[in-house]
């Protein structure tokens, strides 16, 4: 039976196998149901459930779930309209909103004690950002052809500096494939490690004696403040991911 108790600060990031598949005919060693699989499906179920709860049954004023979903919808819609604009903004809005709501829900579920934070795994998030980067590059090449490479030539740059500036712009553009996901994953990973380590220290302090138990409430209040800050960061990072993805799409469409 899989142990779900966190024994060290890094245990919460460990991918555990729940069900493994074996076949005498083909190699299925890499096809397993893991914590990552379970939490990914659970996140999708939560998103679907919250979406179904937004049904206001024909009432003029919706329930609290409807209002919250509408607020997030309008926020992302306004952001995409401001970034991309026009009909193309409406075309790419579902994609950006999907990124936002999935990452936001995953971050909130990852805040539950003893849960598994899928956004802390750099392989997953960076893979997602690489796919976005490749998609934006393909969109740019399909829309503008060879003119797309004008994106790497700063306007009005001297001819003598053009090779150096083009190299810098090319490296900057290529780094987007990593930086988009690395920013989210690093913030999630560091925040969770900080809470677990500080929580463990306070727990050990409060376990020593009655005096340290009482004194432990002082750092415990600080940890609760950090937890509140992490909830805010969970929302901010999902919005930052969405706005950067939208900005990258804008660069591919308009070359600026």
Curated annotation (Swiss-Prot):
TM segment ranges: 33-53, 92-112, 122-142, 148-168, 191-211, 235-255
InterPro entries: ATP_synth_F0_asu (IPR000568), ATP_synth_F0_asu_AS (IPR023011), ATP_synth_F0_asu_bact/mt (IPR045083), F0_ATP_A_sf (IPR035908)
Subcellular location as annotated: Mitochondrion inner membrane
Pfam families reported for this sequence: ATP-synt_A
Membrane topology classification: Multi-pass membrane protein
MF-aspect GO terms: proton-transporting ATP synthase activity, rotational mechanism
PROSITE patterns: ATPASE_A (PS00449)
Transport recorded as keyword: yes
Keyword list, A-Z: ATP synthesis, CF(0), Hydrogen ion transport, Ion transport, Membrane, Mitochondrion, Mitochondrion inner membrane, Transmembrane, Transmembrane helix, Transport
Domain of life: Eukaryota
GO cellular component terms attached to this protein's record: mitochondrial inner membrane; proton-transporting ATP synthase complex
Location, primary (coarse class): mitochondrion
Family indicated by similarity: Belongs to the ATPase A chain family.
Annotated NCBIfam families: ATP_synt_6_or_A (TIGR01131)
Function noted in UniProt: Mitochondrial membrane ATP synthase (F(1)F(0) ATP synthase or Complex V) produces ATP from ADP in the presence of a proton gradient across the membrane which is generated by electron transport complexes of the respiratory chain. F-type ATPases consist of two structural domains, F(1) - containing the extramembraneous catalytic core and F(0) - containing the membrane proton channel, linked together by a central stalk and a peripheral stalk. During catalysis, ATP synthesis in the catalytic domain of F(1) is coupled via a rotary mechanism of the central stalk subunits to proton translocation.
Subunit structure: F-type ATPases have 2 components, CF(1) - the catalytic core - and CF(0) - the membrane proton channel. CF(1) has five subunits: alpha(3), beta(3), gamma(1), delta(1), epsilon(1). CF(0) has three main subunits: a, b and c.
Identification of the protein by name: ATP synthase subunit a
UniProt lineage: Eukaryota, Fungi, Dikarya, Ascomycota, Saccharomycotina
